[in-house]
């Protein structure tokens, strides 16, 4: 039992540190207190903690009477916490992912889609992108013009980039899923989508579909992993040539939404 516990603790520690990124780790080492951390580090640490907590609670509630039915309470909580942490980074699993409920699969996909911090070992859209977009959405609903957090205002440029990243990521995942459902018509949509999101987040979790893949599926999954790791926005910027700056601006128009 002890080697298993030690191994699990090491996996959790390495997964969390790997998902934070070296900028946050170095900042933590130098700052020594939360108040002295940079805005980036505060965002990453706060969002990471909330995602781990939310993932743990919902995974426990959803799988308590399913994949973790025959476990004790402490073991259930430990497994829920482990899956919540590793789903966003390392991709290790202590339960059979192929037997989880559909709502649980959707939960894990959401965590994998968000991923870890920028400049970390994780893929996905990144936690900073997620939290900036979330803040902008809530402030828009509240009719608040200024987007700020931790007494710092968020630049409109970052908000724009966050929404662009999320939209092109959703479009990319949707396109790849559409292609794979054509190639692998015998596999349920939810399982194909899970594989694509897992690859995009460079997580590696699978619902035991490797043996059922057809033709070019493995190659497509590899491409998705590379895109998730490098970042679709970075790839798009590298492929699309920059536009020459204009020395003039048009009069603003009004559009009804």
Regions found by a protein language model. Give the residues of each.
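Transmembrane helical segments that form the transport core of multi-pass membrane transport proteins
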Residues: 69, 73-114, 122-127
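Alpha-helical transmembrane segments and their helix-start/interface "positive-inside/aromatic belt" motifs
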Residues: 36-52, 162-169
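Hydrophobic core segments of alpha-helical transmembrane domains in multi-pass membrane transport
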Residues: 13-23, 48-61, 108-116, 132-136, ...
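Transmembrane alpha-helical segments and their short flanking loops
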Residues: 175, 180-257
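Juxtamembrane interface elements at the cytosolic ends of transmembrane helices
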Residues: 14-40, 53-66, 90-93, 133-150, ...
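Outer-pore turret/helix-boundary of cation channels
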Residues: 47-82, 87, 171-197, 214-215
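Single conserved hydrophobic/aromatic residue that forms the stacking wall/gate
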Residues: 1-7, 11
């Amino acid at each position: 039992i002890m080697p298993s516990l030690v191994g699990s603790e090491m996996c959790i520690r390495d997964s969390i540190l790997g998902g934070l990124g070296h900028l946050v780790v170095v900042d933590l080492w130098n700052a020594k207190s939360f108040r002295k951390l940079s805005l980036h580090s505060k965002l990453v640490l706060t969002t990471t903690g909330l995602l781990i907590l939310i993932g743990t609670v919902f995974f426990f509630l959803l799988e308590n009477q399913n994949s973790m039915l025959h476990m004790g309470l402490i073991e259930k909580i430990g497994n829920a916490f482990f899956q919540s942490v590793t789903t966003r980074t390392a991709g290790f699993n202590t339960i059979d992912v192929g037997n989880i409920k559909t709502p649980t699969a959707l939960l894990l996909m959401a965590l994998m889609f968000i991923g870890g911090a920028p400049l970390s070992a994780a893929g996905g859209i990144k936690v900073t992108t997620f939290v900036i977009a979330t803040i902008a959405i809530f402030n828009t609903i509240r009719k608040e013009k200024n987007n700020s957090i931790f007494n710092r205002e968020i630049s409109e440029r970052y908000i724009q980039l966050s929404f662009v990243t999320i939209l092109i990521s959703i479009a990319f995942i949707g396109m790849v899923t559409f292609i794979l459902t054509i190639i692998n018509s015998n596999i349920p949509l939810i399982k194909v989508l899970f594989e694509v999101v897992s690859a995009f987040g460079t997580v590696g979790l699978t619902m035991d579909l490797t043996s059922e893949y057809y033709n070019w599926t493995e190659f497509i999954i590899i491409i998705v992993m590379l895109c998730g790791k490098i970042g679709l926005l970075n790839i798009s910027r590298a492929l699309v040539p920059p536009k020459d700056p204009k020395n003039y601006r048009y009069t603003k128009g009004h559009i009804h939404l």
